[in-house]
Amino acid sequence: MSKTEENKYEFGLMLPERYQNGIYLFNQSVPTVDEGLNGTVPEKIRRFNNAASHLVRSILTVEQVYIEGIPILQLCQDVDSVYDNTYRQLIRNVYMELFVYQEKLLNIVCNIFFLEIKKSKQKNLVGLRKRSASFPLLCEFCEQCNQLVQDDKYKRVMSIRDDETHNMSQIDSFVLDLEKTEEGLRIVNKGYRIKAETLRAEYVYAMEKLLQIRNLVQEMLTMYDLRDIYTKLKEQGEEIWVN
């Protein structure tokens, strides 16, 4: 895959210049050195980008295998070929990493707006929306997240991911039928329930949606100074929480 193609997958966040000199804390007063260093903006973004790199690596790997394997898929008649099986395993990794990336995006926005991170995504979004009165970009972020969770195509991707974690794989599921033979009935494998091309189209769709949200998070980091966020939240009477 060329460098130009790799640049399509800019899932990481850039550190704004204002945070590059000295230690700039998410927290305004930290009780220990360790918590202070882990609370710096560069460290938060480094950890986010590290998580994003897992997704990028998964995508680049599966795309390379896809390009190399198109002729194999066209020639192979085996419904459970080694190539197809391997490709599906790699796609599964992408689906898993998309979910992790979605969580990381929401978490870093909670960091930026000093909101305690809950286990429920919906509770986090409700908390962020409460804080969005003075921050139009945060309001837009909440709207995009709500649209995403209601998007049928995106929900399908997350449904497939959920089934993978609960040992009910849709990716590895076959269409089976019964066929009469002279010896009696036998089970016939008619191929995978979901075609590899469909799985690929769905994760590409989800990836593009998440990139739109990532771009908005980058804009928030660039446009909003954490000191201003802190001051406005205090004025609104919001509780300040450092994750």
Question: Which residues does each predicted region cover?
Answer:
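Extended, loop-rich substrate-binding clefts of extracytoplasmic carbohydrate-active enzymes
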Residues: 46-75
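Leucine-rich amphipathic alpha-helices with coiled-coil/heptad-repeat character
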Residues: 66-69, 73, 105, 112, ...
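Acidic, Ser/Thr/Gly/Pro-rich intrinsically disordered interaction regions
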Residues: 1-57, 85-89, 107, 117-243
